[in-house]
Amino acid sequence: MSGWYLFSVWLHILAATVWIGSMIFLGVAVVPLLRRPEFAPVRTAMLYQLGLRFRWIGWTVLLLLVITGIVNIGYRGYGWDDLFSGALWQGPWGRTLAWKLVLVLLVMGISAVHDFYLGPRTMQLLERGEASAEQLRRVASYLGRLMTLLSLAILALAVLL
């Protein structure tokens, strides 16, 4: 096995750990802590700032996952021709990879909506004191949970590869 391949796999796993670990930490540690009454005055601003901070980290690791994923597939002997001819998707390994990539694209799409539309829009509405902000906040929270679950499903598929 090539040292570069092993490094790429290691980097891929590290990026996945940062992505999933950060979402789980936010959901099981940060959000429950901020729900305590003494944090009510700073809750919204704190979550928004954490979201902004995580956004660049999250998109960096997602980009790293895509790049290392492509490199890892290349090291397994597949090229762009295999991708477009359908050869990459043959057999159990290829079908598992296909499902993993579908979920990755779904997570990236949901993350884009969450990070670049819902989060900023919710803050605008909250700053204006509009009642619809709470509904958008709930949708953003739901999407965050959905991304976590989909990311865990991606991890399960990765183990099968």
Give names to the regions the model predicted:
Residues M1-L161:
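Polytopic transmembrane helical bundles with strong interfacial aromatic enrichment
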